[in-house]
Amino acid sequence: GSGDVMDLEKFEHAITKYGTPLYVFDIDEVKRKTDYFRDRFRESAGLCFAIKANPFLTCTMSKVTDRIEVCSMGEFEICRELQIEAEKLLISGVLKKKEDITEILNIYGGRCRYTVESVEQLYSYINWSSTHGEKINVYLRLTSGNQFGMDEEAIEKIIASRDQFPMIKVCGIHFFSGTQKKTAEKFSKEIAYLDKFCWKIEQKYGFTMSELEYGPGIAVPYFKDQEDTLEADIEVIKTAISGMKWKGKVMLEMGRAFVASCGYYLTCVHECKKNNDRNYCIVDGGMHQIQYDGQIRGMYQPKCRMYPDGREGKKEKWTICGALCTANDVLVRDIELTAPGEGSVIIFENAGAYAMTEGMSLFLSHELPAVVFYSEKEGFKLARNKQETYKWNMEDHK
């Protein structure tokens, strides 16, 4: 389940060519991980990638998954510019603005799939489809008890009155209850609940949901000594799916489970010093560029390595601090390193999901690091150059 880690030597080339701080995404690992899920689920479930986890991997993932989930207008523009086939897109109803939905409908019409978050939203689709005479495929989002989606009653009403809007094809239910789930029994409970609901609709309205778009929120171990429960979680999900009375198609929608393991964040040591018997490494990156979601800073130890690694000296505990002028800018506390020095590069692992987008990347107007892809076949490839951000933090002046 857990991926193969890139060799230290491979990073040498990237460091020399692109400098630091730097994000590296191992495309081979992304494909390995996706193959791994394919292999485990086979016929029992399809795979959908939520691109919010790592929009840089949109193109790669669109080739290896069945579907791409788009949650914002920006994400839609990414897919459009990359010319991802409309048929692969699931447009999430979290896009609340009517004009956004209308814009997407005007571009792709019935070729995409859409999730519906509210009855009001359904009416935007009904109006568009009757005006344009084009059929639209929708998934009704069932709430998990928060502000998203609709309750069972609202969904039942829609199903009951489906003959009134023949241009809307209800494909199924969309359900997502939260992420980094801790217990396997949560998956089986949810799947049993969804099974019961889909079955009820079949019995009560003579209507079969053909699909269930389900976001399990599988937990990913980011840190040292964190248990990897992936194998066990997959078994539980598979067993629960095979036990369903409802026999439609299940599509698993995931983000970090696919991509967390492919990412690395590289930052270079500028200075090493001792303050009151504590060893500090000051690096050129910082907490604004690396964020493990769910991390309480300093509480967990991310998996890190140092390049070059064969230095002489004794292993000591070091605290790695970034370049931001805040005492909170601690990347790792008490990590054991052997003689780090100026020019040593600290490589953070498991930085493939959310790590680059959840930090405060505009803070202090630092530039955004470059992003590179790595694959055995093509070596390193620049995906995005370093970007200045100061322009976004100042008034436009003539």
Regions found by a protein language model. Give the residues of each.
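N-terminal capping/small domains of soluble enzymes
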Residues: 1-97, 336-349, 353-355, 361
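Flexible glycine/acidic-rich beta-alpha junction loops that bind and position SAM and/or redox cofactors
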Residues: 12-13, 210-225, 251-263, 289-290
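Active-site-proximal beta-alpha core segment in soluble small-molecule metabolic enzymes
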Residues: 42-211, 218, 236, 240
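Short glycine/threonine-rich loop-to-helix capping motif typified by GTGT followed
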Residues: 183-189, 221-233, 260-271, 333-336
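Acidic/histidine-enriched ion/cofactor-binding microenvironments in catalytic or ligand-binding pockets
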Residues: 207-210, 232-245, 332-347
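Charged (often Lys/Glu-rich) extended helix/loop segments that serve as interaction or gating elements
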Residues: 249-398
